Regions:
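Acidic helix N-cap motif at the loop->helix transition within catalytic regions
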Residues: 14-17, 43-51, 97
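Short aromatic/hydrophobic "clamp" motif used to bind/position activated sugar donors
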Residues: 85
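Short, acidic, metal-binding catalytic loop of nucleotide-sugar glycosyltransferases
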Residues: 22-31
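A conserved acidic beta->alpha catalytic loop
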Residues: 22, 38-47, 66, 89-95
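Glycine-rich, basic loop-to-helix element that forms the pyrophosphate-binding segment
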Residues: 64-80, 139, 143
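Non-catalytic, C-terminal membrane-associated alpha-helical segments of glycosyltransferases
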Residues: 210-211, 228-294
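Conserved donor NDP-sugar-binding/catalytic core segment of glycosyltransferases
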Residues: 96-128
Length: 294
């Protein structure tokens, strides 16, 4: 058994360097390689990869000039030499037994998708253990998932029409589920997803919410089911709420509370969640209206 860790990255040289350091410290793993797909970076990503490639890691650099997460990961799998591919993001810290845990979950099984807990942390030094709240029924999450290269290719890989943030891994998960492949959640295959507050600003998350809403429309076009409408929020009551109960004044109130240093932390968190949900819902209505008009 050989594993290929596929990492798509764009302009995250410092985060990528820490991710590679954690992969260099893996123990008990079967033979593995790392394929870093540079998705049109303008920073020193290539230098970081070259530096680590001179060390103990079996590491290869692949360039994908078109900014597109799905396309970058497809390119990485094309270049992968392992029997199994593991996906992780460029801003994670992998515990020393991460690859070994994924490999163990695949041994003795027919083709399956393996997901592990994703623990969002504010700093690279934070290393909590997984709890029940970290369980996820998502069929595939590219921050921490593995499957055979054969199964990935059999369903066609990522749909490269998902060219903005959101839904590309969910869409691939739908096709994998439809292929009748089995699914496992491996508690010991956990990973820390580093999200520093200074990078996780309201402006950044707002942009992601807008992009995710636009990709939700594409997801619904590919999978026009009741389950998909529920998952994306494109159902009657929620769409009515977005049209008539989310005025600019209310979103401005949420944004102000989310940014207030005088408000308690729980108020800021609640206001932030409400603001981002409102941004997503209103953009989803716009995206669906454009699709209907077309």
């Amino acid at each position: 058994m050989k594993m290929s860790v596929v990492i798509a990255t764009k302009d995250r040289q410092h985060a990528l360097e820490r991710t590679l350091a954690s992969l260099e410290a893996q123990v008990g793993a079967p033979p593995f390689e790392i394929v870093v797909v540079d998705n049109a970076s303008v920073d020193a990503t290539r230098r970081v990869v070259d530096d680590y490639a001179r060390g103990a890691l079996a590491l290869r650099y692949v360039a994908e000039p078109e900014p597109n997460r799905g396309k970058a990961r497809n390119r990485g799998v094309e270049q992968a030499r392992g029997d199994f591919v593991l996906f992780c993001d460029d801003d994670v810290r992998c515990p020393p037994g991460w690859i070994a845990a994924h490999a163990a979950a695949h041994r003795g099984s027919t083709d399956c998708v393996v997901n592990g807990p994703i623990l969002n942390v504010a700093s690279y030094e934070s290393r909590p253990k997984p709890r029940l709240v970290n369980y996820s029924q998502a069929f595939l999450c590219t921050c921490n998932a593995s499957l055979s290269k054969r199964a990935f290719i059999a369903v066609g890989g990522f749909d490269e029409r998902f060219d903005l943030y959101g839904w590309e891994d969910t869409e691939l998960g739908v096709r994998l589920r439809q292929s009748s492949i089995s699914w496992k959640f491996a508690w010991d295959a956990y990973i820390w997803h580093v999200k520093p507050p200074e990078e996780n600003t309201l402006a950044v998350e707002s942009r992601k919410a807008i992009e995710k809403a636009r990709m939700a429309r594409r997801f619904l076009a590919v999978h026009p089911s009741a389950r998909a409408r529920l998952a994306t929020g494109a159902y009657g009551v929620n769409l009515l709420r977005a049209r008539y109960l989310l005025p600019d004044s209310l979103l401005a109130l949420y944004a102000g509370a989310a940014s207030s240093n005088r408000a308690p932390a729980w108020i800021r968190a609640l206001a932030r969640a409400q603001f981002l949900d409102g941004i997503y819902a209103r953009e989803l209505v716009r995206a669906l209206d454009v699709a209907d008009a077309g």
